[in-house]
A protein has these predicted regions:
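Extracytoplasmic small-molecule ligand-binding "clamshell" domains
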Residues: 25-103, 247
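Flexible hinge/capping segments at coil-to-helix
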Residues: 30-32, 129-146
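Periplasmic-binding protein-like
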Residues: 45, 122-129, 196, 200-242, ...
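Ligand-binding cleft/hinge of the Venus flytrap
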Residues: 53, 67-76, 154-173, 203-207
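Short helices/loops that flank or line small-molecule/ion binding pockets
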Residues: 72-73, 81-82, 86-100, 113-115, ...
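A ligand-binding cleft/hinge motif common to bilobed small-molecule-binding domains
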Residues: 104-112, 157-162, 182-186, 190-219
Length: 268
């Protein structure tokens, strides 16, 4: 009798353990966003034209407009949360934000840590120099001082060309690209390595006298980063992005910021 009771208790405990494991492993990431009626987007608010503050201090940009459209269709409120870009993965994994969405380059290293949507835009890492500069190639920058944003994909691009990196006199990290460009303008550094999309927008809209060297260091793609376990939330955002692309709304948003559709969702 005692043996039967013991067996029954052990079976009951096993069932509880199995059901408990099942619940803890359940992906309710999308449901959590629905329940709190808020999608928290982590971004660098000094990264035009993807996400930045306008003259009134309001956060605007291509990614911001796209995220607003996604949230409108998902019927949840959007919260824009500026973060330290150099600590973006920590901000995400701590639960402070639901995603990283701000000209976020998909790299192999990041894919090992995060879950990404499919790419929605292509970009290049390029070198920026002052207008009238005699620098035309990477070779011309031998022994010179290069600036880049800390924690950005520019650092990955630089590491991918070790010969060029080793030829430089110094590499200086900045909190953001705009600070690096200001230091370039003052003569503190000789070149800035950054996203071409950001550089060309800045040159055009801020009327700054910089030039982009034709020789790129790397080509890349932008995606939206989520926690590895948040598959359901990522899929919901991906589905919505595809719908926005299909009905032409994404083209309108892209044309507003870039003068044409440079997105790649649905492109063959």
């Amino acid at each position: 009798m005692k043996k039967n009771i013991l067996t029954f208790l052990l079976l009951g405990m096993a069932v509880l353990l199995i059901s408990g494991c099942g619940e803890s492993g359940k992906d309710n990431s999308w449901q959590k966003v629905k329940d709190k009626n808020q999608f928290v987007l982590g971004l660098d608010d000094s990264f035009p034209p993807m996400g930045f503050r306008d003259e009134n201090g309001k956060i605007v940009g291509f990614d911001v407009d796209l995220a607003k459209e996604v949230c409108t269709r998902l019927q949840v409120k959007l919260k824009l949360q500026p973060i330290n870009w150099d600590a973006k993965e920590q901000e995400l994994n701590s639960g402070k934000i639901d995603c990283i969405w701000n000209g976020f380059t998909i790299t192999e290293e990041r894919q090992n840590k995060l879950l990404f949507t499919k790419p929605y835009m292509k970009n290049r890492q390029v070198l920026i120099v002052t207008a009238g500069s005699t620098y035309r190639t990477q070779t011309d920058l031998k022994g010179k001082k290069l600036g880049l944003q800390a924690g950005s994909s520019a650092a990955d691009a630089l590491n991918s060309v070790p010969d060029f990196k080793d030829s430089l006199g110094d590499v200086v990290e900045f909190d953001d690209n705009m600070t690096a460009l200001m230091d370039l303008e003052k003569g503190g550094i000789d070149t800035v390595l950054m996203d071409e999309i950001v550089a060309r927008y800045y040159i055009k809209n801020k009327h700054k006298k910089y030039q982009v060297l034709e020789q790129e260091l790397a080509s890349e793609e932008y995606g939206i980063g989520f926690r590895k376990k948040d598959q359901k939330l990522m899929e919901k955002v991906q589905e919505t992005l595809e719908a926005i692309s299909k009905d032409g709304k994404m083209k309108k948003i892209s044309t507003k910021w870039f003068g044409e559709d440079i997105t790649v969702i649905g492109a063959k």
